[in-house]
Each structure stands twice: as structure tokens, then as C-alpha cells.
Amino acid sequence: ILPVTPPPDIDLEKWAASIEKIREWQPELLFLSHFGAASPVNDHFEGLIEAFQVWSERVEKQLAGTGSDEEHATAFARRLRDDVVTRLGESDAIRYEMTTASKMSWYGLARYLRKKTEE
């Protein structure tokens, strides 16, 4: 599962609450904008939650280190692309990057994490 977390307002707590609300409905199938049907639903949600956790931890570590946002976003996108190539192959990785702009997911998570530390 590869979520999209672009700025300005990704909110991981609201995502988690939404996932739980949908789980309560016990759907057999999800129809995802741009991605089609997803089943089994629980596996999809577990993958989504895991990806949010892994991605936010990566961004949090980068924010605690040195380097510019651009450097961090580029490194995040490169690592994500490597993950996609490993799991899906080169051609799917190219299509994924063309449709998602994974660097923007870094910026969305970075903004979210910075706002959380300001609260």
C-alpha cells in the first residue's frame, strides 16, 4: 500500500479515525479514487497504517537531522522509488512516480509533523 500524503493538510490522527469508522461498516470491498477496487479491506487498511507509520518515522528522522527540505524530500522519494521497484518492478515504479509526485508526500508529512511539534 502506497498512500499519498501531499500538503497542505495531511492529518494522521484523522486518517486513523476515518479508517476505524469505515472498518465499523465492515465493507467487503473498497473503491479507491484513481486506484480501483481493494480487497481484502482489512489487509488494505493494515498496509495503509503501516505505510503511514514507516513514512512518518522516516520524515521525523530527517527533520531531526541536517540538510535542506529539498535534500530530504529527494532522499525520501528515492527510497520510496527503490521500495516500489523492489515490490512491483521498474515500469510500475515509473508510473507510480508520474502519478503521485512522492516528493510532495514528504512535504505533506513534514508540514504535519512540524505543526504537531508547535502545538
Locate predicted features:
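Divalent-metal (often Zn2+) His-rich catalytic cores of metallo-beta-lactamase-fold enzymes
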Residues: E13-D69
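Conserved phosphate-coordination/catalytic loops
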Residues: D9-E13, T100-K103
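Surface-exposed cleft-lining segments at the edges of enzyme active sites
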Residues: I1-D9
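C-terminal regulatory/interaction regions
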Residues: R58-E119
